[in-house]
Curated annotation (Swiss-Prot):
Primary location: membrane
Underlying gene: mdtH
Pfam families: MFS_1 (PF07690)
GO molecular function: transmembrane transporter activity
Family according to the record: Belongs to the major facilitator superfamily. DHA1 family. MdtH (TC 2.A.1.2.21) subfamily.
Lineage: Bacteria, Pseudomonadati, Pseudomonadota, Gammaproteobacteria, Enterobacterales
Compartments where located: Cell inner membrane
CDD domains (alphabetical): MFS_MdtH_MDR_like
Annotated protein name in UniProt: Multidrug resistance protein MdtH
GO cellular component, one term: plasma membrane
């Protein structure tokens, strides 16, 4: 077997193992943050939303710098350092009894993600052939869903003993992931050339089409991040027990494991990437409107099911579309910048969603945040339609050295 083919084959298995640990470590802790601090300790949802939004904004908003540094120095040192930083964030979260401590822990967690996320994404592009990426992203999403359920189940079980144990468990998993990367990951260069940091940044910023696409996705992410904030709070409120949150993630896992790969295989032969992205976003947006008026757990879970179906359709297409638009000479920079929409959408979605949730309850209008989210989804859909109705999707190749 040629050396590159062997590297690709082994690389797939390593990427899947690494991804499983990262997803597991994240979902042991993060789905329980809103339950712990809002429902158990009685903090305002806005305070917790700021913490979650801060993590999202730091991780994704600074991702272009993490990606540019990885373009220059390689993936391995950035990934290991980032994972250890996230572990330290979870340690601080274990002792958080004031908002500033929670914010600090989320900031450290986000900074860790800034360092390890772009090079990990760029490794997928490097090791997976273009014609196989859509299916591989679907496999990663299926794994994400299974890992989310297993992580949430472990976290929910540990929460009955102590939230500190939950956080320490997440920290140990990320230390293990860092050790695995230190031991097994070769010193890959993730770009086709050793791009200087400023050149990689400049190349992305000059790509107006990619810039517009990334910023448009802000609205998409404002909906997507509610899986970690308002949806768990809503499930807990209606069910009356935090243990019900695991059913939300069980639904996601069941749908992903049964539908995600078949839908991706079927749709990639019949529809363009942007059409699949917009169809998924449409379903996600429609599911938002009735949630605030729901009083039965069964109805809420059905709406969450609809939301997840939209996500299953949209997410592989979004990831593949981002990869197809990236310039191979600065993959890390492109993949880092592609997270800017998630940074903005996450920051606004978490803090704005938390504020709207508190305001809706204070005004006795619990449907307010969900109506606003649905509206934002449709506005984003219109922007995507306008953008892709007049542009062909090809990788950017800009001049310069």
């Amino acid at each position: 077997m040629p050396l590159m083919s062997q590297a690709r084959s082994l690389g797939k298995y390593f990427l899947l193992l690494d991804n499983m640990l990262v997803v597991l470590g994240f979902f042991v802790v993060f789905p329980l943050i809103s339950i712990r601090f809002v429902d158990d300790l009685g903090w305002a949802a806005l305070l917790v939303g700021i913490a979650l939004g801060l993590r999202q904004f730091i991780q994704q908003g600074l991702g272009i710098f993490g990606g540019a540094i990885a373009d220059r120095f390689g993936a391995k040192p950035m990934i290991i350092t980032g994972m250890l930083l996230r572990a330290s964030g979870f340690v601080f979260m274990a002792i958080a009894d004031e908002p500033w401590l929670l914010w600090l822990s989320c900031a450290l967690s986000g900074l860790g993600g800034t360092l390890f996320d772009p090079p990990r994404t760029a490794l997928v592009i490097k090791l997976i052939r273009p014609q196989e990426r859509g299916r591989f992203y679907s496999l990663l999403m299926m794994q994400d869903s299974a890992g989310a359920v297993i992580g949430a189940l472990i976290g929910s079980w540990l929460l009955q003993y102590d939230f500190e144990i939950v956080c320490w468990t997440g920290a140990v998993i990320f230390v293990l992931a860092a050790a695995l990367n230190a031991w097994l990951l070769p010193a890959y260069r993730i770009s086709t050339v050793k791009t200087p940091i400023l050149e990689g940044l400049t190349r992305v910023i000059r790509d107006r089409r990619f810039l517009m696409y990334v910023l448009t996705l802000t609205g998409y992410y404002m909906l997507a991040v509610q899986v970690l904030l308002m949806l768990p709070i809503m499930v807990n409120e209606i069910a009356g027990t935090p243990s019900a949150v695991k059913w939300m993630y069980a639904i996601e896992a069941a749908l992903s494991l049964t539908l995600l790969y078949p839908i991706a295989r079927w749709s990639e032969k019949r529809f363009r990437l942007e059409q699949r992205l917009m169809a998924g976003l449409f379903i996600m947006s429609v599911s938002m409107f009735p949630i605030g008026m729901t009083t039965e757990l069964q109805t809420l879970l059905m709406l969450i099911c609809l939301f997840y179906i939209g996500s299953i359709i949209a997410e592989p297409a979004r990831e593949t579309l981002s990869a197809s638009l990236a310039d191979a000479r600065a993959r890390g920079s492109y993949m880092g910048f592609s997270r800017l929409g998630l940074a903005l959408g996450g920051a606004i979605g978490y803090s704005g969603g938390g504020w709207l949730f508190d305001t809706g309850h204070a005004l006795n209008q619990p449907e307010l945040p969900w109506f606003m989210l649905g509206t934002i989804g449709f506005l984003t859909l219109a922007a995507l339609y306008w953008q892709f109705n007049q542009r062909r999707i090809e990788p950017a190749m800009l001049g310069g050295h």
